[in-house]
C-alpha cells in the first residue's frame, strides 16, 4: 500500500481509496516520536544473583556511569530488594532508569523461600499499576511505572550446571518478567569450559520448562540479528569501569598477571552483545512485552478473582456492564442473605435472652417467696418469744408486788408487837430483871 493511500472500513471488508493530494497524516510517526521524547522513557531492571557476582559493576559498565550504591554483605538474614532510580540523558532522550538489586540472595543456609520476596515485589508493582488503572481519574501519563521490564539473572561461573536455587527462582519468575540469563565473571573459566557450560545451562532450562526471553524475530529490521543473538544465550559477560591503555586507545578492561581482558572485545566476552540486545535493539520490546504479556496475565487473573470475565458459562460474549450488573445482583443477593441471616440470628438471640430473663425472673420470685416465708417464720418466732418474755415479765411483776405487800405487812405486825412488849415492861417491873 502506498504512503498516500487510506484504508476505510466498510462492513466486514475494506477498500483502498486513493487521495487526490497530500493530507498530512504521514507525519503521525514524527508526532509520536516528538511526544515520546518530550515525555521521556522509563526502564526498570531487576538484577538477581548471589552476592559478589558483579551485578553493580555490570550496571555501571552497561550505562557507562557510576551509580551510587552501598555494597552488600553476606550476612543478610533474608533476601531484601533495594531499588534505586536515576535520571539519565543521551542526546535529547531522557531515561528514568530504575535498578532493583536482590540483596542477600543465596546467602542463607535455608534457601527454600529465597524467591518469594522477588515474586512479591514484582506482583506489588503490577498491583500498583492496576490500582492506578482502576481509578476513576487516571493519570497514567504522569504515573511512574515501576513494573520490572527485564530480569538479568546472574549465574555463578561454576562451569558445571545450574544450581537448584537458580532453576527454582527462574521457574517462579518466567511468567512474571522477561528473563535474560547471563554468566557472570566469565573470565573465571576457560573458553572451552564456557562453551560447554552454556550448552548445559540451555539444556537444563529447556528440560525444566523455564521460559526465558527470546529476542523477537517478527520484525524484519531486527529479525536477523535477534535470531543470531538468541543462539548466543546465555551471554557470558565481564564488567569493569577501569580504563586501561591498550595500544593507542583507552579501553575498559581488567588487568591480570597473565594478560588483559577487554570488556568490549567480543572475542573476550559477550558484553557488547548484551548491551546491543538489551538497550539499542530490544529495550522497547521488553517494555511492550511487560505490558502486553506479563502485566496482562496478572491483570486477567486479578479481574477473574474479582469475578470479571469476557464470556458467560455458555462461552458467549460478556460485556463489562453485564459483568458489573451480574456482580452487583450477586452482591445484593448475598447482602440480603446476610441481612436475613443476621435478622434470624438477632431474633434467635432475643428469644434466648427472653427465655434467660424469664428463667431469672422465675428464680427471683422463688427466692423472694422463700425469703418471705423465712421472714414470716422468723417474725412469728420473735413474736412468740416476745409474748413469752412479756408473760414472764408480768408474772415477775406480780410476784414482786406480792412480795412487797407481804414485806410491808410483816413490818407493820412486828412494830405492834414491839410496842406491846414495851408497854408490858413498863407496867411490870419484874420483867426488867429477867
Curated annotation (Swiss-Prot):
| Region of interest called Disordered, as start-end residue ranges on this chain | 405-434
Sites where Phosphoserine occurs are at: 27, 416
Coiled-coil residues: 321-409
Q: Does the keyword Nucleotide-binding apply?
A: yes
Residues that the record marks as modified (N6-acetyllysine) are 367
**Annotated region described as G4 motif, given as residue ranges:** 184-187
Residue numbers bearing the Phosphothreonine modification: 418
**Ranges of biased composition (kind: Low complexity):** 407-417
- Record domain Septin-type G: where: 39-305
Question: Do you know which InterPro entries this protein is assigned to?
Answer: G_SEPTIN_dom (IPR030379), P-loop_NTPase (IPR027417), Septin (IPR016491)
Q: Region (G3 motif) spans which residues? A: 101-104
| Entry keywords, A to Z | Acetylation, Cell cycle, Cell division, Cell projection, Centromere, Chromosome, Cilium, Coiled coil, Cytoplasm, Cytoskeleton, Differentiation, Flagellum, GTP-binding, Host-virus interaction, Kinetochore, Nucleotide-binding, Phosphoprotein, Spermatogenesis
Binding-site positions, GTP: 49-56, 104, 185-193, 239, 254
What processes does the entry annotate via GO biological process terms?
cell differentiation; cytoskeleton-dependent cytokinesis; mitotic cytokinesis; protein localization; spermatogenesis
**Family, per entry:** Belongs to the TRAFAC class TrmE-Era-EngA-EngB-Septin-like GTPase superfamily. Septin GTPase family.
Please describe what this protein does.
Filament-forming cytoskeletal GTPase. Required for normal organization of the actin cytoskeleton. Involved in cytokinesis. May play a role in HCV RNA replication. Forms a filamentous structure with SEPTIN12, SEPTIN6, SEPTIN2 and probably SEPTIN4 at the sperm annulus which is required for the structural integrity and motility of the sperm tail during postmeiotic differentiation.
State any further remark: Coordinated expression with SEPTIN2 and SEPTIN7.
Q: How does it assemble?
A: Septins polymerize into heterooligomeric protein complexes that form filaments, and associate with cellular membranes, actin filaments and microtubules. GTPase activity is required for filament formation. Filaments are assembled from asymmetrical heterotrimers, composed of SEPTIN2, SEPTIN6 and SEPTIN7 that associate head-to-head to form a hexameric unit. Within the trimer, directly interacts with SEPTIN2 and SEPTIN7. Also interacts with SEPTIN9 and SEPTIN12. Interaction with SEPTIN12 alters filament structure. (Microbial infection) Interacts with HCV NS5B.
In its UniProt entry, what is this protein called?
A: Septin-6
Species name: Homo sapiens
Amino acid at each position: 500500500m502506498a504512503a498516500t493511500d487510506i484504508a476505510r472500513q466498510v462492513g466486514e471488508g475494506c477498500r483502498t481509496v486513493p487521495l487526490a493530494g497530500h493530507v498530512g497524516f504521514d507525519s503521525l510517526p514524527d508526532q509520536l516520536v516528538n511526544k515520546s521524547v518530550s515525555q521521556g522513557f522509563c526502564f526498570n531492571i531487576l538484577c538477581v544473583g548471589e552476592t559478589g557476582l558483579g551485578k553493580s559493576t555490570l550496571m555501571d559498565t552497561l550505562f557507562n556511569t557510576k551509580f551510587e550504591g552501598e555494597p552488600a554483605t553476606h550476612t543478610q538474614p533474608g533476601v531484601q530488594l533495594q531499588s534505586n532510580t536515576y535520571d539519565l540523558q543521551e542526546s535529547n532522550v531522557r531515561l528514568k532508569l530504575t535498578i532493583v538489586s536482590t540483596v542477600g540472595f543465596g546467602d542463607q543456609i535455608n534457601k527454600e523461600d529465597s524467591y518469594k520476596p522477588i515474586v512479591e515485589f514484582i506482583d506489588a508493582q503490577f498491583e500498583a499499576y492496576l490500582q492506578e488503572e482502576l481509578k476513576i481519574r487516571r493519570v497514567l501519563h504522569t504515573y511512574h511505572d515501576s513494573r520490572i521490564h527485564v530480569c538479568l539473572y546472574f549465574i555463578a561461573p561454576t562451569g558445571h550446571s545450574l544450581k537448584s536455587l537458580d532453576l527454582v527462582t527462574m521457574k517462579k519468575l518466567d511468567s512474571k518478567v522477561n528473563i535474560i540469563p547471563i554468566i557472570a565473571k566469565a573470565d573465571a573459566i576457560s573458553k572451552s569450559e564456557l562453551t560447554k557450560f552454556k550448552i548445559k545451562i540451555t539444556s537444563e532450562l529447556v528440560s525444566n520448562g523455564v521460559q526465558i526471553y527470546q529476542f523477537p524475530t517478527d520484525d524484519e529490521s531486527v529479525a536477523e540479528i535477534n535470531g543470531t543473538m538468541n543462539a548466543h544465550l546465555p551471554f557470558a559477560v565481564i564488567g569493569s569501569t577501569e580504563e586501561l591503555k591498550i595500544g593507542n586507545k583507552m579501553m575498559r578492561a581488567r588487568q591480570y598477571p597473565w594478560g588483559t581482558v577487554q570488556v568490549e572485545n567480543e572475542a573476550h566476552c559477550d558484553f557488547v552483545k548484551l548491551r546491543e540486545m538489551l538497550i539499542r535493539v530490544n529495550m522497547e520490546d521488553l517494555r511492550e512485552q511487560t505490558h502486553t504479556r506479563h502485566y496482562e496475565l496478572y491483570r486477567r487473573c486479578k479481574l477473574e478473582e474479582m469475578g470479571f470475565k469476557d464470556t458467560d458459562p455458555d462461552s458467549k460474549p460478556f460485556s463489562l456492564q453485564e459483568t458489573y450488573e451480574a456482580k452487583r445482583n450477586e452482591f445484593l443477593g448475598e447482602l440480603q442473605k446476610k441481612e436475613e441471616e443476621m435478622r434470624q440470628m438477632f431474633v434467635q438471640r432475643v428469644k434466648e435472652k427472653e427465655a434467660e430473663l424469664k428463667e431469672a425472673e422465675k428464680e427471683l420470685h422463688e427466692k423472694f417467696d422463700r425469703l418471705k416465708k423465712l421472714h414470716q417464720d422468723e417474725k412469728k418466732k420473735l413474736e412468740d418469744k416476745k409474748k413469752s418474755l412479756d408473760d414472764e415479765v408480768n408474772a415477775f411483776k406480780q410476784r414482786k408486788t406480792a412480795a412487797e405487800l407481804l414485806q410491808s405487812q410483816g413490818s407493820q405486825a412486828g412494830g405492834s408487837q414491839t410496842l406491846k412488849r414495851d408497854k408490858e415492861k413498863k407496867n411490870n417491873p419484874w420483867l426488867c430483871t429477867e
